[in-house]
Amino acid sequence: MSSALLSARDLVAAGTALLQRALATLDDAALAEPTALAGWTRAHVVAHVAANAEALVNLTTWARTGVETPMYASPEQRESDIEKGALLAPARLRDWFSTSAAGLDDALGLLDGESWTRLVRTAQGRTVPATEVPWMRTREVMVHAVDLDGGVGFDDLPTDFLLEVLHDAAAKRSRGADGPAVVLVSTDPTDTLDGTPRSTAWPVVGLGDAVTVRGPLPQLAAYVTGRRATGLTAETGTLPVLPHWL
């Protein structure tokens, strides 16, 4: 396995640990409390992340065998799995999260060089190589660890992840181009752990003249992923409202 893939799997493990940490701070009653995600309790978030792990196992099966195995049978099945999962007894829900995460880790470990290059299809319909699967999981566990509101914030997420999610979310928003045009500018040092300089500005193609939004890296990541952000300034004085991210 290449060093890049090892690093990608390390980020998955780090995100899983952060979400597990947030989940461990919450008692069973807290799982029924609402989150900032419309219509979702904390239990919905946990169920979604658990179901996502199983869906990504389907993509690893596709990559390993060459037999088309979609993430979900249908959008309706995806929603149904989340709703049913949110109603599980708290102990079963916690166990589902843990076992599904471990199952995905095992499935990723079965992929070889040829498997990693095989093309699979995301739930959004994009065709990507299987090397994208670790990133897809990292994005889920990192951001939803924050959504649980269990003591993990964007400030706790690794710098390498923040940089990558800014690039990823800005690119996705630019493909849709259905929201306001903005340029996100970090006011923080953004060198990675190995000292390699990285971008400090991320343009989002959209409607109207681009508005420059400045602030700390973690808060820019929160903003571009549609989460509550603080400490940001917009040159117009008002932060543009971004549409739904994923």
Regions found by a protein language model. Name each.
Residues 25, 36-39, 110:
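Short, conserved sequence motifs enriched in acidic/basic residues, glycine, and aromatics
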Residues 2-11, 30-52, 80-93, 120-139, ...:
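Alpha-helical scaffold segments that form or flank carboxylate-/histidine-based iron centers
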Residues 16, 20, 24, 53-57, ...:
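Structural signal for well-ordered, non-membrane alpha-helices
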Residues 2-8, 61-68, 110-246:
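Structured surface interface patches that mediate subunit assembly and partner/cofactor docking
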Residues 1-7, 55-103:
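Short, helix-capping/interhelical loops that line the mouth of catalytic, cofactor-
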Residues 25, 48, 223:
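Conserved catalytic core of Hanks-type protein kinase domains
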Residues 9, 13-31:
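Short, Lys/Arg-rich amphipathic segments at extreme N-termini
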